[in-house]
């Protein structure tokens, strides 16, 4: 008798995790690869990345590759899938691949929410290279945000935090802004001496501006002793609070005992200042709210959503969660 399998994918802007899970919750394979966001790669490019990972997973699980679907159900939770039309594009491309009998495509915020709660509802805010939020009410109503950056009113995530550090360092050097230790540590991260040298390197193409994302951990470290860095972290906390507050209000859940889950690489890299500030602000807005980091990785959330649709036992889901939490690589976006 053929074993019933679930295929789970958590695809971010910097990495992709793929897992194969049996109906008993056993994790047969877990592999990691490069980013797969269709926002950057398109639907087919996204699935090319996932397809290569699937081949690796089949090898690890010692499963044959045939023309038959690999899994009965597959859950693809991807950064950059922000509109129904984008979900449809990926769904259409998946039908051609034929990896699963049934597929579910959604934004990666759903993975964080499901990883953090058994309820199936609540609010999740994800801070990775960017920032996003999802709210789900007990009756299934949803609040989502396009999360396209500045054009949809967003600030937050690793890139924005890093660029804010570059901005502050430059203004510290030329006198337009307050003095900050970022003036020294930001260029030093790139083996340069001054913010001016850093600006020249970016301007002349010797250094890609996108590498500003590397500075987020630097900002968190400096925030312990530098006021300007601390203000950047506080600004990020305020953005997380704003997203969660709006989601709660639009779902009429502000006064309810809602779980607010925080996930993503930037949350994992941050210290207690960020989560503490978010928790303090949100519990003032809604005293019954609980705010916590997700204890399980997003790939566990993607797997649990697939297993939900497969109709397996609670024990099987708990096994999958435990195994994925114990063996998943370090969190990222």
Protein language model annotation of sequence segments:
Residues 1-65, 70-71, 95-96, 115-121, ...:
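ATP-binding/phosphotransfer module of carbohydrate and carboxylate kinases, centering on a glycine-rich
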Residues 81-180, 184, 328-333:
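Phosphate-binding/catalytic loop of phosphoryl-transfer enzymes
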Residues 46, 77-81, 127, 221:
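N-terminal loops that bind phosphate or other acidic moieties
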Residues 77, 106, 259-263:
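Solvent-exposed beta-strand sheet faces enriched in polar/charged residues
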């Amino acid at each position: 008798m053929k074993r019933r399998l679930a295929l789970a994918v958590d695809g971010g802007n910097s990495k992709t995790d793929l897992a194969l899970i049996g109906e008993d919750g056993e994790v047969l394979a877990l592999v990691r690869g490069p980013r797969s966001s269709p926002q950057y790669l398109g639907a087919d490019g996204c699935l090319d990345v996932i397809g290569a990972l699937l081949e690796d997973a089949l090898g690890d699980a010692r499963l044959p590759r045939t023309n038959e679907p690999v899994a009965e159900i597959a859950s693809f939770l991807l950064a950059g899938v922000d509109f129904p039309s984008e979900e449809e594009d990926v769904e259409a491309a998946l039908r051609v691949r034929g990896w699963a009998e049934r597929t579910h495509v959604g934004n990666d915020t759903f993975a964080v929410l499901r990883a953090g709660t058994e309820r199936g509802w609540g609010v999740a805010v994800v801070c990775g290279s960017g920032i996003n939020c999802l709210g789900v009410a007990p009756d299934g109503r949803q609040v989502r945000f396009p999360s396209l950056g500045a054009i949809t009113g967003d600030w937050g995530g690793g890139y924005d935090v890093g660029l804010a550090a570059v901005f502050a360092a430059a203004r510290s050097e030329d006198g337009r802004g307050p003095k900050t230790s970022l003036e020294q540590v930001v260029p030093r991260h790139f083996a340069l001496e001054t913010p001016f040298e850093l600006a020249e390197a970016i301007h002349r193409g010797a250094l890609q501006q996108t590498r500003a994302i590397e500075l987020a951990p630097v900002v968190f470290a400096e925030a312990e002793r530098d006021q300007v860095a601390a203000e950047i972290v506080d600004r990020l906390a305020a953005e997380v609070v704003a997203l969660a507050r709006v989601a709660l209000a639009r779902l009429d859940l502000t006064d309810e005992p809602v779980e607010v889950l925080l996930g993503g690489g930037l949350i994992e890299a941050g210290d207690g200042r960020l989560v503490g500030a978010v928790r303090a602000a949100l519990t003032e807005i809604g005293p019954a709210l609980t705010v916590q980091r997700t204890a399980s990785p997003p790939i566990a959330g993607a797997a649990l959503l697939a297993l939900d649709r497969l109709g397996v036992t609670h024990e099987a889901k708990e096994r999958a969660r435990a195994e994925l939490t114990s063996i998943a690589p370090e969190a990222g976006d």
